[in-house]
Amino acid sequence: MAEPTNPFPQLPHAAPFLLLDRVLDVGERSGVFLKLVSAADPCVGRDGRLPAAFVLEALAQGGGALLAALRGGEATPGYLAAVDDFRMLGEVRVGDQLRVEVEMLRNFGGAVLFHARALVEGEVRAEGRITLKSPR
């Protein structure tokens, strides 16, 4: 059996923890990505919901993918350093197409602040500010 292809080689994540499936758009300060929520996804609970922690991780991966794209696709190790005003506003369930939108607010050198939100069918299901930090 062939290994699944990584659509985001610039992220250090591998299946099953690579949550994003597709790049929809990348601009100068923002990016839009897609996660297809499947019953086969090991992150999905027995109740068919994607837990808030994984929604937050998808937002962080969107920020990392945007940074890598802005750096010419260069993979840069980093981590989620801070989460502010994060709110879950609805459920994310099997069958949903989770749209991940990130907008870069400030770049502090080694740390970047984003406003991030997750939407399903145009409805915001989660949002907040996240900070990603790079060790270099």
Q: PLM ranges: what are they?
A:
Residues 17-19, 98-99, 112:
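Hydrophobic core residues within well-ordered beta-strands of beta-rich domains
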